Amino acid sequence: MIIIGAGLGGLSTGCYAQMNGYRTHILEMHELPGGCCTAWDRGDFTFDCCISWLLGNGPGNEMHRIWLELGALQGKQMRHFDVFNIVRGRDGRAVYFYSDPDRLERHLLELSPADARLIRDFCAGLRAFRKCLAVYPFLKPVGLMGRFERWRMLASFLPYVNVIRKSITTLMTDYSARFKDPLLREAFNFILYEKHAAFPVLPFYFQLASHANLSAGVPEGGSLGLAKSIEQRYRRLGGEVTYDAKVEEVLVENDRAVGVRLSDGREFRSDIVVSACDGHTTTMRFLGGRYLNDNYRRLYTSTIDEPGMIFPGYVMLFLGLRRAFPQSEPCTTHLLDQALAAKLTGLRHASVNVQFRSRHYPELSPEATTVVYATYFSDTAPWRALNEGRPEQNTRRHRGRKVHTLPLRHGRDYYAAKHQVRDALVTFLDERYPGLRDAIAVRDLSTPLTQVRYTGNYDGTVLGWQPFVEGGETMEEEIKKNGPTLPGLANFYLSGVWATTGGLIRAAAAGRHVVQFICRDDGREFTADVDDSAPPPTHVIIPITDGPVRHEG
């Protein structure tokens, strides 16, 4: 089996395939595993750009089982802050989004007694969702469930049907508009750091409930550490991975996938090909637009370019600071005035999320130093226009080998925009944390075009198809009906974020699911085991307001 891509979807696919007796070989364009789940070094600092919360990093749900099967968490400390996010208004007022519904309710009532009814309604829904998480199905795709399994799944949701129905049919933009307090009216849209205009209330409940259940913290070692742990699990299972290997074509004979051709002309033959990389590249380049039914053709030729159909890219500013900032908050979304917002190229909504990342991952920077991570959702088109048509990805020799992800020269206006964004954000941060500017040792700013260079993702998107809109819904319905395949092409499967919607746990689950489909097609019984090569993870609760650090088993 050839697997294209060593992101979490590809690594997961490889692990589960090895567990079920397949001999697999992962081909990865980059020199590292993880795809978007990555980090890079600048001097003494490691800049971790992915995991701000990891769904399923604690027990009590099926998500956790997947991470344990992949060896992602074992031997590590899971860290949980007592606040999911803080939203600071332009007037300095702040909303602390505690994930504990009782604490959240008390805080919100103090901020706006006039909104008591709506506050209690939201927190009641959150309480119900904490219990609901235990029955959410992640281990087996709905498309493989028999009639009895589907009925049993639906029956398990019966106690929560009202909260699910209400929360999935009400957009958060509409729900938040009911608040009388202007800060709450705006802040609720930014619970998940950025504004997700197409999201109903349900995913807000899902993330907060997971966080309250100690199953949405961060793992020791960070994003690249997580990816490397899964890669090690894959290798222990007997899997093979080749880096700096850029696939250019899926080889097809008699409507059967039989291997791949790399950019250097080498061919790798296989009985099965699984693509766990960018969906547009897979369908339109690797396969030349063949084997697409009407739904897939519409998705990848028109829907993908419609506003809001795929997740945007990010602008990310990292600062490595020479000293500690003990009063810093782990995670805060700042609502911006228009003067600052106008300086931030590609900005979708007038906000920026600021994390003092060394609170999450102290092991990734020297003692008594700080890493700041400031991000905003960004459209790609403005950055592409500033790039003046220059290449966004290129292959060249570096230290005796062909490398596909090295930095490129961009247009002069592109660099000017990067400097403007960097300087505007540093000024903003220095006003709130005096001395920050003078403490900067290293800095790094990336744009959606950086994402294109590193991963090849369409338009620099970080997560592919958006849920709750036509693109994601059409794709999920297609896979539920026909499996993660393309019509008319045998021995070919899709995995990773382009075969699902959502974040890292969805990518990891997609790997499990695609191997279940492969086993069904081959007449094999699917099996999966928890990795026992290291002890179970431990958990620590870190208060960002007053209170002691709590350790749990």
Annotated model-derived regions:
Residues 51, 497-519:
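A conserved FAD-binding loop/helix module that cradles the flavin
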Residues 181-195, 426, 431, 435-501:
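A glycine-rich dinucleotide-binding beta-alpha-beta segment and adjacent secondary-structure elements
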